[in-house]
Amino acid sequence: MVGVTSISSPAISADERSHEVDHPSSLVAHFGADQPLPLDCGIDLTPFQIAYQTYGELNADRSNAILICHALTGDQHVANVHPVTGKPGWWETLVGAGRPLDPSQYFIICANVIGGCMGSTGPASINPATGKVWGLDFPVITIPDMVRAQAMLIDRLGIDTLFAVVGGSMGGMQVLQWTAAYPERVYSALAIACSTRHSAQNIAFHELGRQAVMADPDWHNGGYADRGIHPHRGLAVARMAAHITYLSDAALHRKFGRRMQDRDLPTFSFDADFQVESYLRYQGSSFVERFDANSYLYLTRAMDYFDIAGDHGGVLAKAFAGIKTRFCVVSFTSDWLFPTSESRALVHALNASSARVSFAEIETDRGHDAFLLDVPEFFDIARAFLESAGKARGLNGRGG
């Protein structure tokens, strides 16, 4: 069982330690008016807080820290029982004793992103200026904003250089942003099932989900919290539509085919006759119990805005010019949300910038979500990459 472990650091005050119970099972770092978060939209967010989890212990020279960046609907509960759902952590396949990210060797950190809804400041938080829930008054945030906030947390923890930054999907975008914005602070980077910019198709899928949320009569232009209601129907539809993109035709056929749900014949109604219908309805209904609808709008928009070459004249290689970080880029053959062609474009740009990079395309029919599932080849690649990076840094055997 992986435990949640805090660290002793003079940068974290006793008063802040007293606030660790602000959110179930999470540590919370508070940043006051003297430490505003500058956002890309031109607004300084202050005050704000970041909810996070840690696993393992930071070694004496603070060289074994790994930051995990979560995906769109993830959170900081990587390898512990989720306080809302009661389910195992979302990446227990990768994080744990004997696994590629082993807390006995590494100090592992995962923070709920700014704009999220599991303890970090977001649209579901209280606006200190009004005493009410932010709602749509919350400023629009970007992937660089998320990473900027994470860097402030890493500073607070007294860590100069991260041994590795790891993430898939939206988490992979954060990994790339970390290496572009703070290249001297990232020794190695594992970017999984992601892209350097969101495609037109993916923006379209996100707009579909946002429109489903906003069409729900209970949304009230984002002001549902003040009315004590939630746009669960719209958010459930958004989740159902998005979840399809995380799968593959082959996986859906293998798992469900055209099999009926608890019946032999069609009902000639609009009930969930097919197993795949029942599965999607479950995905939608379970999601709304743990996620905020406005956060969904904000985080999908942040992904849409992501274009790491945008500040470099559209030349991707310039974003990584002179970088010393070791990269491992991973894609999956059946991922049509972030296809391998996008990972190859990233690898070509890294090669053009003379970065040290390895690339793996893994054969699987499990779609985009393969990085969250039991795919042994992926685990082997992640383990080998981290062990190689650890050996190069003289880290192996010195964790904890």
Swiss-Prot record:
Transfers an acetyl group from acetyl-CoA to L-homoserine, forming acetyl-L-homoserine. SUPFAM superfamilies: alpha/beta-Hydrolases. The active site is at S169 (nucleophile), D335, H368. Its main location: cytoplasm. It comes from Bradyrhizobium diazoefficiens (strain JCM 10833 / BCRC 13528 / IAM 13628 / NBRC 14792 / USDA 110). It is an enzyme of class 2 (transferase). InterPro entries: AB_hydrolase_1, AB_hydrolase_fold, HAT_MetX-like. PANTHER family: HOMOSERINE O-ACETYLTRANSFERASE (PTHR32268:SF11). This is Homoserine O-acetyltransferase.
